């Protein structure tokens, strides 16, 4: 169980919510995963996996392997902080992650974080357990 301490995943997850993370196992595009970055646990959404080509337009539209992603979980599209060269091919054994709050999230769009090693993933966020009025699965 983890307590969320940032706003990069709003509107899906909010500050001070408690979530349950299923240890390791498999994950796929669209899943929210927890991983270590600089001794801190971050939560982000898997956008692409090894070999995929990611492109992000100025308006924030995300394209993976030539197909525009349907992202109902994103409130407002934004390019956000991005200093990688696009289009970008995800390296072997890595995943490309982005926060749902695109204008403020620092994620794989930056060289600072980059793509996440699959082995750094702690697990998939599967359940919100607090606040009680929002208890349920996380998509």
Regions of interest found by a model, annotated:
Residues 11-139:
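Soluble "head" domains of membrane/secretory-pathway proteins
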Residues 2-3:
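Short, small-residue-biased leader/transition segments that mark boundaries at the very start
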């Amino acid at each position: 169980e983890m307590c969320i301490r940032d706003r990069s995943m709003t509107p899906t997850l909010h500050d001070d919510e408690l979530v349950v993370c299923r240890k390791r196992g498999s994950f796929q595009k669209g899943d929210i995963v927890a991983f270590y970055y600089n001794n801190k646990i971050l939560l982000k959404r898997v956008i692409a996996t090894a070999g995929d080509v990611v492109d992000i337009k100025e308006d924030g539209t995300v394209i993976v392997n030539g197909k525009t992603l349907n992202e109902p979980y994103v409130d407002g599209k934004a390019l956000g902080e991005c200093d990688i060269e696009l289009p970008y091919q995800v390296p072997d054994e890595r995943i490309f992650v982005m926060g749902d709050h695109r204008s403020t999230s620092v994620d794989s769009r930056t060289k600072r974080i980059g793509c996440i090693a699959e082995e750094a993933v702690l697990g998939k966020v599967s359940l919100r357990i607090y606040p009680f009025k929002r208890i349920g699965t996380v998509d």
